[in-house]
Amino acid sequence: MEKDFQFTFLGTSAADFSLLRSTNCQDRFDKNARRASCMMINDNIMIDCGMHAMDSLRIAKKDIAKITDIFITHFHADHFNKGFVETIAEGKANPLRLWCRQDAKIAPMNNVDVIRMEEGTYYHVEPEMNVKAVYANHEESAFPQHYVFDLNGKKVMYATDGAWVSNRAFPYLRKNNLDVLIIDATCGDYSNDRRLAEHNSIPMIRLMVPFLKTAEIIRDDTAIYLTHIAPSLHKPHDETQELVKADGFIVAYDGLTFNV
């Protein structure tokens, strides 16, 4: 019997955070009080572990003792916190595995095994899960990469931070026929912002979708989730969801789950 994988959005914000988060939403998730982007697969695998990760894990009632692996998309503070990683690793019988780009510069951490990933190569993580990393178009000094999770033949891509699809990543993505694409949507429904060199806007994603289908990176039935939402650049959640309803996009929010 094939294993089901549950994905939980622990955070869906870019690095400008709503004041609601630190006022009346300290102990709960709210669609308009997003925390730093972070994700959980089942109860043992995290994607990113940034400045709000411990709060998000607490609110989601996740037991850090069960966490075996953390995949780091890049080393900006909203995605990686060394102290939090060491807190999660503390006391484990087996070292916590931290996955990152092959050339990442990272200080040693207690009880943490750093696994440096060769671009485009699948790594076996656990039964029924293999993962490959591809280059991300984001600030190079943060060693960015995106991930494609192969789960019993079903493929989920986590693509934040980063803009467009780079020619370096393209050979490893074409014909992947993703079941789910989770994509950076930092900027709102407009096309003139300095961040568009390393983040997506909604118009950029609309432009990409036909090409992604032509390249068989996605299919007509691929679920597309927008995450890494900058509150200052977007309308409130419900308005943003209505805005992309015709596109078939799903605007992710903290606490949202889906199964693969």
What are these regions (language model features)?
Residues 12-13, 44, 51-52, 75, ...:
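Active-site metal-binding loops of divalent metal-dependent hydrolases
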Residues 2-60, 143-160:
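Conserved beta-strand hairpin/beta-sheet module of binuclear metal-dependent hydrolase folds
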Residues 4, 93-152, 249-258:
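Metallo-beta-lactamase
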Residues 58-61, 122-127, 169-175:
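Short amphipathic alpha-helix with an adjacent loop that forms part of the alpha/beta core around
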Residues 45, 69, 154-158, 180, ...:
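Structural motif
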Residues 7, 48, 57, 74, ...:
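Divalent metal-coordination and catalytic microenvironments
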Residues 50-99, 177-181:
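Active-site metal-binding motif and surrounding structural segment of the metallo-beta-lactamase
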Residues 164-257:
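Cap/insert and terminal regions of metallo-dependent hydrolase folds
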